[in-house]
A protein has these predicted regions:
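Histidine-rich, glycine-flanked metal-binding segment
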Residues: 1-5, 11-55
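Activation segment
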Residues: 15, 35, 65-67, 85
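Short, ordered, surface-exposed loop/turn motifs in non-cytosolic proteins
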Residues: 18-22, 80, 173
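Short Asp/Glu-rich motifs
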Residues: 44, 64, 95-96
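Di-metal (Zn2+ and/or Mg2+/Mn2+) metal-binding site signature of metallo-dependent hydrolases
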Residues: 52-73
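Divalent-metal coordination cores built from histidine and acidic residues
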Residues: 69-165
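Single conserved hydrophobic/aromatic residue that forms the stacking wall/gate
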Residues: 164-173
Length: 173
């Protein structure tokens, strides 16, 4: 008996094949069977008249800060996203010298219009280097996978000192 069986869903498998009505078995959090006659589940979900798809990958997000405090990375997880990529647009929070935190928050706020107050309240800054940032992310519980690029703005601020850099203004952006 499977842990979960999703019954009679319109399965879109992501390969370009035609949509097929099938059942999906899940055991220990992993898909173990897709098809018909896959057996019973301890929990069964009727997906009749509903699409069932693989998780989506969002290749351009700005969860760099939010990923350090929000295990759901909402709202993306509510929309079927199972993997996010951040470090986009050159803005992010690692590497980060302790005296550059406010500057990096202002950069993210200015370029991406993410409220600086939310970032300042949420980010714990328990890293300085990029590998330490990855370690901090790894320790966080989360409902989706993450991938991150090294943001060039943070690298530049770390290497040259953020005090020599000018933040973009609303007029420039």
């Amino acid at each position: 008996m499977h842990d979960i069986v999703i019954r009679s869903g319109k399965v879109v498998d992501g390969t370009g094949k035609a949509i097929q009505q099938m059942d999906i078995a899940i055991d220990n959090g992993l898909i173990t069977a897709v098809g018909n006659d896959i057996g019973e589940g301890r929990t069964e979900i009727d997906a009749s008249n509903h699409l069932v798809t693989p998780g989506f990958v969002d290749v351009h997000t700005h969860y760099d800060g939010q990923a350090t405090w929000d295990p759901e990375m909402s709202p993306s997880s509510y929309h079927g996203v199972t993997t996010t990529v951040f470090g986009n647009c050159g803005v992010g929070f690692a590497p980060a010298q302790p005296d550059s935190h406010d500057w990096l928050i202002q950069l993210m706020e200015g370029v991406e219009d993410i409220p600086g107050a939310a970032l300042a309240e949420g980010i714990e800054w328990n890293w300085e280097t990029f590998p330490e940032y990855l370690d901090a992310l790894e320790k966080m519980p989360r409902v989706m996978d993450i991938a991150t690029q090294v943001p060039h703005g943070s690298v530049r601020a770390y290497a040259v000192s953020y005090t020599h850099l000018t933040l973009p203004t609303k007029r420039i952006v």
